[in-house]
């Protein structure tokens, strides 16, 4: 099957899986990235090594029409930033890292942890006019534990999503015809800066969720009139009488007292 692909490196394994499933990739779409928190190097390298045309500008209706006229049968989107036009006969599939219809939005992984959910998943759905609202083609749920972080959740998604993408490509005609409408759902805005902040007055439970939700991306500890950016840390739950905000070092690890625990700093940003 001839396809086009849109995305960046977070879900790059989907692109490889589609090729292994027998798809011929006709064109690759990505978007400009900072190559600090977001990358497109793997996607671009995939295209260049195979001589596949690629672009980092927005997909247009004209792009999709040309693909359709050239015999392309589908476009698969996995983490693509821009809105994909829907005025096209080309079947457009989006890979979304949440168990829709709950978790619509640009960055559902940290939201899953911040909300204390015990389940998430990956959903493949038709691209529709509303973000993440299209009929569901395939989805798979997986458990989320109290030890999961943004990094472990992302790795689970990077394992599940390619398998679903390959299965969708193999059975696209059948899945497209039997897709299930989502109905009412829940949209999660991208977390704001204040949601990434831990203060000495926070409960250990809230601090734990923040530290796990932004592990590897970074969060902020705000105390004593200063802000410190932390890349990785963890919260140790413990009863104590130490004043919140007090810092000590244990085994070479800096720790800040919280209400009901300690914030341990493993890596500064």
PLM feature segments, named:
Residues 1-222, 247-269:
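One-carbon transfer enzymes
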Residues 234-250:
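A conserved acidic, glycine/proline-rich C-terminal tail/linker
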Residues 224-239, 263-269:
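A short acidic-to-branched-hydrophobic micro-motif
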């Amino acid at each position: 099957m001839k396809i086009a692909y849109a995305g960046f490196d977070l879900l790059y394994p989907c692109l490889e899986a589609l090729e292994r499933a027998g798809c011929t990739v006709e064109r690759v779409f990505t978007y400009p990235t900072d190559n600090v928190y977001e990358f497109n190097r793997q996607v671009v390298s995939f295209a260049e090594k195979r001589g596949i045309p690629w672009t980092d500008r927005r997909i247009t209706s004209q792009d999709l029409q040309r693909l359709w006229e050239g015999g392309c049968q589908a476009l698969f989107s996995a983490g693509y930033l821009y809105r994909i036009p829907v005025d096209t006969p080309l079947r457009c599939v989006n890979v979304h890292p949440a168990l829709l219809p709950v978790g619509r939005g640009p960055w559902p992984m940290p939201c899953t942890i911040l909300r204390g959910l015990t389940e998430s998943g990956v959903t493949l759905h038709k691209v529709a006019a509303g973000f993440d609202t299209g009929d569901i083609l395939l989805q798979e749920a997986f458990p989320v534990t109290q030890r999961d972080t943004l990094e472990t959740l992302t790795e689970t998604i990077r394992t599940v999503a390619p398998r679903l993408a390959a299965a969708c490509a193999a059975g696209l005609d059948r899945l497209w015809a039997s897709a299930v409408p989502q109905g009412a759902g829940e949209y999660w805005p991208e977390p704001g800066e204040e949601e990434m902040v831990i203060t000495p007055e926070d409960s250990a439970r809230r601090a734990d969720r923040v530290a796990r939700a932004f592990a590897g991306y970074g969060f902020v500890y705000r105390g004593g009139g200063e802000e410190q950016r932390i890349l990785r840390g963890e919260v140790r739950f413990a009863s104590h009488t130490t004043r919140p905000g007090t810092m000590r070092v244990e085994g070479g690890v800096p720790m800040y007292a919280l209400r009901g625990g300690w914030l341990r700093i493993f890596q500064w940003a």
